[in-house]
């Protein structure tokens, strides 16, 4: 072999060695995940920082509304840097799945930790935390013994008493979707009509506003998510604390299907460049320790049965959940939106 051939061989070997070294360095540097999230809670920031410290995996957080994130994933396609989509409401996760934006995940940890009704049957999304949609009532003007079910809110004794958000709110859409799933479309429409008749005002504001309106005497009942009560009770604003203290919590439908629940949930995106790390992150989020952080700081119920709830959540008592598979909320979302429109929900009691 000539000296030129030997030199060429060493050059090739050197370049190959450098290439492998660069690839290994690049792999080490890419110990990261990119998270598209709709959530905006301080608890999440705490959890993300703990994950980074414990694993060395960096989290690149991109925040926007759920609709914006789903649209972003669609437009980016195979070029998307996203590994995960985190949002509230199962219906949104179903929509992302139906658009082909999520992929199946194989994880013994997730299979054994998360109940089947709180996740996608193809493991394309998973519930991380639960929130119950309950009836908040004025402690001064309503006795809890007067309350029973969502359906009973249409009784005439509640005329001009009910406060609630507008129909474009995803929590209301999912509640109505659950009523359609359990009772059928005809009964659900009758319920929605009865609710409109009993509205105290035109639907407006967020869940916190409904609770404040009870304190202000604008109505006696409101349908809200439990974690908002926790946030108001722990607010630095005394007006919000007073509003939360003025209401009691009632978990409806305890003698039949149980109280409607919804979730914050997550899925691995279809073209996730860091799939293994993404799965590791989801497994971390449903661990006992992290689930208890969500319960303590964001007043959400754990999906992990081994996790303890916070003292506040425990004080509200145990309750029976509606175990309707949450995928149904997405499947019936369109029917719920149509029903709201048919009964003129947003025009309030004067519409009928």
What are these regions (language model features)?
Residues 36-39, 121, 137-139, 145, ...:
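Short beta-strand->loop
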Residues 20-95:
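Early extracytoplasmic/lumenal segment of secretory-pathway proteins
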Residues 311-352:
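Extracellular/periplasmic bilobal clamshell ligand-binding domains
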Residues 15-17:
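C-terminal motif of bacterial Sec signal peptides marking the signal peptidase cleavage site
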Residues 93-101, 118-148, 177, 261-267:
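Periplasmic solute-binding protein
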